[in-house]
Structures are given as C-alpha cells and as structure tokens.
Amino acid sequence: MLSYYAFIFFAKIMEVALMTIRTVLITRGEKLYGSIIGFIEVTIWLYVTSSVLSGIKDDPIRMVVYALGFTCGNYMGCVIEEKLAIGLLTINVITSESDGKRLAEILRDKNVGVTMVDAEGKIEQKKMLIIHAKRKRREEIIRTIEGSDINAMISVNDIKTVYGGYGIRK
C-alpha cells in the first residue's frame, strides 16, 4: 500500500511540474514544446486521477497523498522553471551620466548588448541603460552591475518577444 501512495505522490508531482513548465512555454511562444508536454501531462493526470477516485471511499488517504503531490508539484515546477530560465528579459539601469558610460563599457566587454539613452532625474541628468538578454544571463548581468561599485537603480521585466538585437537570438 505504501508503494501505491508513493506512486500517486510522485506521479502527481511530475504531472503538476510539467503543467507549470507547459504554461510557461506556451506563454513564451513555445507552442510545439508546450503541446508535447501537455500530452504527457494529461496522460499522467488521467491515470493518477482515475486510480485515486476509483477507491477513494475505501481509502481516503489517497486524496491526501494526491493533494500533497499537487502542492509539491507546484513548488518543483517553479524550481525547474527557474533553472531552465526560458525566455527573455529587459533590464533597465538608471545611473549618473559618467557612471552610465562606464557601466555600458563594462557590460559590453562581457558581450551584453546595451542601449544607452539620456534620462532626466530630479536633480541631475542621468543615463538609462536598456539591456535585452536571455533570462539565463540575469544573475550574471545583475552581479556585474552590482559588482561595478556604480550607484544604480535596476529594474527587471520578463518580456515575450524581441526582434533583432545583439546576443539574444535563439
């Protein structure tokens, strides 16, 4: 009986983790991969759900194990998605004029595409650096900015599509 509960638990974790990844893939424009994962996901769901429901009155622990698997699956899906880092992002950096030029050079030396535009702060002129990059490079770019000893305001946004640009083609 314990192995049956383990099967329900781990199959549900796998199914929900796949659901999370499928959702992310589809929202990022990866329809084919999302559809393939969806097929696997629904196959697991049908098998697990039917096996839980077929004897739920006699063995209500199945329901608890199923719910625990669902909960852990959500967490695992988020962890896996974070590691895969599928997609693109935009990092906006606002800093002083002189620091902006220096930071742009530092980033460009690391093969990061940077567009620099003039910006107006409350007290002084600023530079805004606009960086479009793969999500996999997020931590590297943020560490580079923070490690440069330049006072900067950083914002990061996930984006769906970028056309053209430096260093972000698939």
UniProtKB/Swiss-Prot annotation:
The chain crosses the membrane at residues 1-21, 36-56. Belongs to the UPF0316 family. This is UPF0316 protein CLJ_B0679. GO terms for cellular component: plasma membrane. It is found in: Cell membrane. It is a multi-pass membrane protein. Its main location: membrane. InterPro entries: DUF2179, DUF5698, UPF0316. CDD domains: YitT_C_like_1. The keyword Transmembrane helix applies. Keywords: Cell membrane, Membrane, Transmembrane, Transmembrane helix.
